[in-house]
Amino acid sequence: MQHLVDATRLAMEHKNWYGALALALTMPDICGRISYPHLAKKSEERYVLWFDTYLAAKYQGGFIQEQILARANMYALRCAFLHQGEFDITDQKARQALERFHLTTPYTGLMHNNRSMNIDADGNITNSVLQLSIDIFCEDVCAGIEKWMSDNATDARVASEIRQLGILHAGGSSF
């Protein structure tokens, strides 16, 4: 798993934001599969359980202490970006109230984890957008993955699953 965290950070270092984001959205899937083997065909459930444990606390706040990045929206972003290349999640069945993400590259003074929305005369929320700074978001996911690895460091089954992950071999090596 550490090789994927390192690859995410290397992508950020080289300003390969799309690569970093793709890995950051994929790693919780891997951890969820390993952590919750009894949920074999339920990737969404595994994903949000991992999110609740390792990332949700970083995305709670605001004036009413709401969950700014809800578990369903995190999974919807994963689906929209990895399968369709989009940040608009309106077509994702997993989403919760949010319509789209506005991801930005690093910029001093830019607000991270900032939600914008309109409320119509009937009290309905429209045009709900969550702005995330991609470097902070990806690093938060990396930190969550490292916490997960630490929490599971003595679990032989988890260690065995991690050893089975795909590893790239140096050019010229034979099998």
What are these regions (language model features)?
Residues 40-49, 54-58:
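Lumenal/extracellular "mature" regions of secretory-pathway glycan-modifying transferases
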Residues 1-46, 65-69, 73-76, 83-91:
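Amphipathic alpha-helical interface elements
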Residues 52-167:
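Long, charged low-complexity segments
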